[in-house]
Every structure is written in structure tokens, then in C-alpha cells.
Amino acid sequence: SYTYNWHDFNDLICIILKTIIEQGKGIEINTAGLKYGMPEPNPCLDIVKMYHDLGGEIITVGSDAHEVKFFAYRFDVVADMLKNAGFNYYTIFNERKPEFIRL
């Protein structure tokens, strides 16, 4: 299994997240790696917390479901993760406009 130490890239990740926020964009939490033994969705909880603490609000959830059986795979994990990071909602897009759904 592959692991990485995101702390090695902390400064760069912070710059990227600030840029995303300044441009009114968001990030996605993706659960696909959980199918292959990763310990948590990507990005990890610490990066999601950093995004929140920097003022990030738009956050979507994906699973890379290339098969029906993986549609919304382990989204239960993400709900808890978002709450632990300080979020009260996640984001969906309707006609390219963000809508915030309470957790």
C-alpha cells in the first residue's frame, strides 16, 4: 500500500488551498482509495481541516464509481470526516451553482 507524508508539502498545499478559496472554487473528498486499502479518503482529514480553517466552504464528495456497486462508496465515512473538520454541510452543484446540503 502506498502512503505519503503530506507534511513534506505543507507550504505548497497551503498555497494551493488559499488560491482555490480566493477563486471561489472548492475541493473534493474522494473515497476511491478506500476500495484499495487506503486508511482514509483523499485528501486526508488534516488537509480537509486546513481547507476549512483557511476559509474553504465548497467541498464535494466523490467515489470514482466506475461500477454501480461503488456509487457513493463509503460516503458515511466522509460525513463524519467533514463534521470532524468543522463543516456543517457538503456541496452539490445544480446548473453549475453550488448548493449546500446540511450533514
Residue ranges, per PLM feature:
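Active-site-proximal loop/short-helix segments
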Residues: S1
